[in-house]
Amino acid sequence: MPLTPPPDYTRVYTALAIGASIAFFTGLITRNTLPSVGDLQHNLPHGGRYRDGTKSVEYCGPRKLNSVESGSRWTFQPWLLVIVLVALIIALGRQGHNCRACGRSH
């Protein structure tokens, strides 16, 4: 009986890892994290006003994207900080590195 190598399952594991990653990130991105306002019949997640004979609800909606961002417009925005840092890294990386011996860029 000839010896045969065991089957290679790396493609199966790679496909499972990619599928699980896509499912995880899709669930993470599409998750609703807005505060729930209203009752079972009247839900106002993006703001609004509802009034009937016995109750009234007025909700102005969220003013910021998440709990990390501040309430003001441009003081501290995490995405703006990331963009500025990436631009700074790219700009500093493009500076020519000159040779200390001859002064030229190699």
Curated annotation (Swiss-Prot):
Say which domain of life the source belongs to.
Viruses
Q: Which residues form the signal peptide?
A: none
Topological domain (Cytoplasmic) residues are 1-8, 95-106
Classification via InterPro entries:
Plant_vir_prot (IPR001896)
Q: Which UniProt keywords apply?
A: Host endoplasmic reticulum, Host membrane, Membrane, Transmembrane, Transmembrane helix, Transport, Viral movement protein
Which Pfam families did the record assign? Plant_vir_prot
Q: Does the keyword Nucleotide-binding apply?
A: no
Ranges in the Lumenal compartment?
Answer: 30-73
Location of the protein in the cell? Host endoplasmic reticulum membrane
Instruction: Report the record's Gene Ontology biological process terms.
Output: transport of virus in host, cell to cell
Q: Does the keyword Transport apply?
A: yes
Q: Name one GO cellular component term.
A: host cell endoplasmic reticulum membrane
Main location class: host cell
The regions listed as transmembrane in this protein's record are 9-29, 74-94
Q: What does this protein do?
A: Plays a role in viral cell-to-cell propagation, by facilitating genome transport to neighboring plant cells through plasmosdesmata,.
What the record says about family reads: Belongs to the Tymovirales TGBp2 protein family.
Q: What does the miscellaneous comment read?
A: TGBp1, TGBp2 and TGBp3 seem to act together for cell-to-cell propagation. TGBp1 is the main movement protein that physically cross the plasmodesma with the viral genome. TGBp2 and TGBp3 would facilitate TGBp1 function.
Q: What is this protein called?
A: Movement protein TGB2
Give the source species. Answer: Lily symptomless virus (LSV)
